[in-house]
Amino acid sequence: MAAPLAQLRDRFQAALAASFGPEWAATDPLLVPATNPKFGDYQSNVAMSLAKQLGQPPRAIAETLVQNLNLADLCEPPAIAGPGFINFTLQPSYLVAQLQQLQTDERLGIQPVSPPQRVIVDFSSPNIAKEMHVGHLRSTIIGDSIARVLEFQGHEVLRLNHVGDWGTQFGMLIAFLQEQYPQALSQPDALDISDLVAFYKQAKARFDEDPSFQETARQRVVDLQSGEATARQAWQLLCDQSRREFQKIYDRLDIQLEERGESFYNPYLPAIVEDLRRLGLLVEDQGAQCVFLEGFQNKEGQPLPLIVQKSDGGYNYATTDLAALRYRLGQDQAQRIIYVTDSGQANHFAQVFQVAQRAGWLPAAAQIEHVPFGLVQGEDGKKLKTRAGDTVRLRDLLDEAVDRARTDLTTRIAAEERSETPEFIEAVAQAVGLGAVKYADLSQNRNSNYIFSFDKMLALQGNTAPYLLYAYVRIQGIARKGGIDFAQLDPVAAELTEPTERSLAKQVLQLGEVLDEVARDLLPNRLCSYLFELSQTFNQFYDRCPILNAEEPQRTSRLLLCDLTARTLKLGLSLLGISVLERM
């Protein structure tokens, strides 16, 4: 079942062809949901956009289009407003028919795409021997939500964790541990991730001030690269310990990922450099092998190259990212690749993509996209830090969110004189706390910085996870109070006699349109905005329309609207990685 916007678009493009010739059939009709109900449900300003090309006044173009629009089963007669806006109001009979189809459809009328794409989403990507911090939160949950939406649409999605598991820092850390804590490299449980972070800081300080230690660390890098057994064993232990800690975070956040770290691409790095040399793209600059690119300059206005092999013969992030991109396009056969990293890496990926383009590695139809995001800030507007000035550990942040949710819940339970089990309190605290953290991030336009506030994200009012969860809980409460099993309700034609009933019905039908937007523009905040508006509309409906006390057939009609709203909220929240609750 196509969403209303998709059906309107198809009819509109047929009218464009009928009005101005078949060459106009692919023109974007510029249809958008109306921002004010007095203008109907959807609007188009395509007449204004075509005026210059067609050499006609916009209003005349609009009149011609309206004459050729076949919409009797879908909309009221279109209205032309102002200089040439075309306004559309959906027919009540159309809304009723669409709702009836949704009642028995587990996917709420959203059909899988055809044909599906093979998509890779590269996200999270923490560094081995370092703790995940608040900066990893954004990549992890934005990437997860994008992957969930694409998977629901029917695409074949490979979720990749490009962990930082290679580099000179390992030589430094292994040398330090061999010297100071040799038992840590032979006993898997001898240290945890916090120990590794502390040891890394000590090793770095030692490296910066001790030339002898520098030489030892560099030798360990050589040992590691050559596959020397002791060095490889130590490296593997460090990786395994870090993975266990990462997995604890992923399990808490319900994140699925396939690890394919930087080291995976090591065998492919020499060929990257050799192929770029063969193609005549490499230029030697101060001993390094570089590709000079169009549009990239340093602060002095000089050309800024992408270095793919250092002067000492070593490789870097750019070499690895080029190898990863070529592998994903070749062996993985990806048609769309999405990189979810902070906006500070935008130039890096733009350079990598341009090199791949010039080397001829990008198929014409391939979509390669960097999905940047801004900083998480404290309430002082600065980068979020602990009171001691350190980076906030992700596990500490999640713990505090759950603790605060637990405190809020126990306070509310006491005020309501309810009695709840410890198991209930813990389950709700986990769902609300973690859901609030995810939603607070995803509800922001990812391109912007946002201020992290526990008080705001855990509030029961406003655009928050608790507000949306409570709308779902309220619907389950209606079912419990009335002794109703929504699944057993007989499908009936909806009675849309009240304005809020019609608004709610229309919004339920728009989920597919919103998911198309998210999949196209990779902006999960649009799904959040939709779910928030749906919750607001439901609460208005709940306040204004009797449900359990209504007469039939209105009672069943309103119960079915409640059920469709709950199912839409549950599905939408699941695509954000948030679980619903029966009670709060």
From Swiss-Prot:
Chief location of this protein within or outside the cell: cytoplasm
Protein name: Arginine--tRNA ligase
BP-aspect Gene Ontology terms: arginyl-tRNA aminoacylation
SUPFAM superfamilies: Anticodon-binding domain of a subclass of class I aminoacyl-tRNA synthetases, Arginyl-tRNA synthetase (ArgRS), N-terminal 'additional' domain, Nucleotidylyl transferase
Source organism, top-level taxon: Bacteria
InterPro entries assigned: aa-tRNA-synth_I_CS, Arg-tRNA-ligase, Arg-tRNA-synth_N, Arg-tRNA-synth_N_sf, ArgRS_core, DALR_anticod-bd, Rossmann-like_a/b/a_fold, tRNAsynth_Ia_anticodon-bd
Subunit structure: Monomer.
Keyword field contains Aminoacyl-tRNA synthetase: yes
EC number: 6.1.1.19
Ranges spanned by the short sequence motif 'HIGH' region, renumbered to the chain: 126-136
UniProt subcellular location: Cytoplasm
GO molecular function, one term: arginine-tRNA ligase activity
UniProt cross-references to PROSITE patterns, sorted A to Z: AA_TRNA_LIGASE_I
Catalytic activity: tRNA(Arg) + L-arginine + ATP = L-arginyl-tRNA(Arg) + AMP + diphosphate
Similarity comment text for this entry: Belongs to the class-I aminoacyl-tRNA synthetase family.
Keywords, alphabetical: Aminoacyl-tRNA synthetase, ATP-binding, Cytoplasm, Ligase, Nucleotide-binding, Protein biosynthesis
Source species: Synechococcus sp. (strain ATCC 27144 / PCC 6301 / SAUG 1402/1) (Anacystis nidulans)
GO CC term, one of those recorded: cytoplasm
